[in-house]
A protein has these predicted regions:
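Basic/aromatic recognition patch in beta-strand/loop cores that engages polyanionic ligands
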Residues: 72-100
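Compact soluble domain cores
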Residues: 2-10, 14-77
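Enriched for short, Lys/Arg-rich terminal
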Residues: 91-120
Length: 120
């Protein structure tokens, strides 16, 4: 039995498919990026564009099985998952909310790991 407080679980395929479709479409009206996520990604990669970040996030969610951690207690309603992604060979932490409509995502986090590279 795992004593890990937040074990990594498979992220549901339906959630991943919806989020990837929104990220790949790239419509600003469907992607809310919180200021912290925008600032931290831009600080680490000042020459990157939003579509670069979105593409890296989508690529991370595309494999058949992706492990992550469900997140509860966010202000906005929806299903939130944290997971790892890579951009320019740098491991990054992501946290994304797929809102109940299934047509809008909120990117809360897109930054280098703050709690170590093994803790989501």
């Amino acid at each position: 039995m795992s004593h890990e407080p937040n074990p990594h679980l498979p992220i549901p395929a339906a959630w991943r498919k919806s989020v990837v479709a929104i990220l790949r479409k790239g419509e600003k009206a469907q992607i809310v990026v919180k200021q912290r996520a925008r600032d931290e990604f831009s600080a680490r990669f000042p020459d990157a564009w939003p579509y670069d970040r979105n593409g890296a996030l989508a690529d991370a969610l595309t494999p058949t099985e992706v492990l992550g951690r469900p997140i509860f207690g966010m202000d906005e309603p929806g299903e939130v998952w944290a997971f790892w992604f890579h951009f320019r060979n740098v491991k990054l932490y992501a946290k994304i909310n797929l809102t109940p409509s299934g047509k809008l995502i909120i990117i809360y986090s897109a930054h280098v790991p703050l709690k170590g590279e093994d803790k989501l």
